[in-house]
Design a protein with these regions (language model features):
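Acidic, glycine/proline-rich Ca2+-coordinating loop motifs
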Residues: 1-229
Length: 229
């Protein structure tokens, strides 16, 4: 059965355990856990997310699957909403709540962190794919409010590079803005709702593009590949 509840944002279909059957990774937003449905080959699937990886993203957005190191195993990229610089992180994201984190884990959900994940496929154990999250080591853990990753060989060197689409029209999570709004009474907020929405800050953010360095790390290539504002 794959009829599980989740705030699903995307799904990637690939043969993660190299058994000839397509599996399904479902990326879920907020505390609802991701699912990794392994194809049993008989029309049924089994969720193996906890057996396959130690951690996932929290605000899970888009995903893409590809072999990033040409070892014949399919890896997975999942984007979240962590800004690359400290100023934007503090302005737009609350700190992780340890009490909420552990209550979620103790309720049977997975370990989820507010950063991108790059799940490097290490092979299989009894038909279950085993992943290591190398997003920080690879240099792709924080790419702002990201929507979807795309792997492709953009420079034609035989390795999968990474494009990430980003951005929102307004800074809808800007904490300084909401601190100012909170100073206005509830009725006045209703009366001035349109004016207040127009005052919401905005900050253009580049889409990100990363060159695959061939050693499971990536380098941001926006300037070199003319993909900056």
């Amino acid at each position: 059965s794959i009829f599980n509840f989740g705030l699903a944002i995307s799904a990637s279909i690939a043969d993660f355990n190299n058994d000839g059957f397509e599996d399904i990774y479902v990326s879920n937003d907020f505390s609802t856990p991701d699912f990794l449905y392994i194809n049993n080959g008989n029309g049924t699937f089994t969720d193996k997310i906890k057996e396959s990886t130690n951690q996932t993203a929290f605000y899970g957005m888009g995903t893409d699957a590809a072999d990033i190191n040409n070892d014949g195993l399919i890896d997975l990229m999942q984007v979240d909403m962590a800004a690359q610089d400290n100023r934007r992180q503090k302005a737009n994201m609350a700190s992780m709540n340890p009490e909420l984190f552990w209550s979620t884990v103790n309720a049977g959900f997975h370990h989820q962190y507010m950063y991108n994940t790059l799940q490097l496929n290490r092979g299989t154990v009894n038909g279950t794919p085993i992943f290591s999250n190398i997003a920080f080591a690879a240099g792709v853990a924080s790419t702002d409010w990201s929507w979807c990753p795309l792997f492709a060989d953009f420079d034609n060197d035989g390795r999968k590079d990474l494009f990430i689409s980003n951005g929102t029209r307004k800074e809808v999570n800007n904490r300084d803005y909401f601190k100012q709004v909170d100073k206005i009474s509830g009725q006045e907020q209703l009366n001035q709702s349109l004016a207040l929405s127009l005052e919401m800050p905005e900050e253009p953010i580049d889409n990100y593009i990363f060159k695959n360095n061939g050693n499971t790390t990536f380098s941001k290539a926006n300037e070199d590949w003319s993909l900056s504002h």
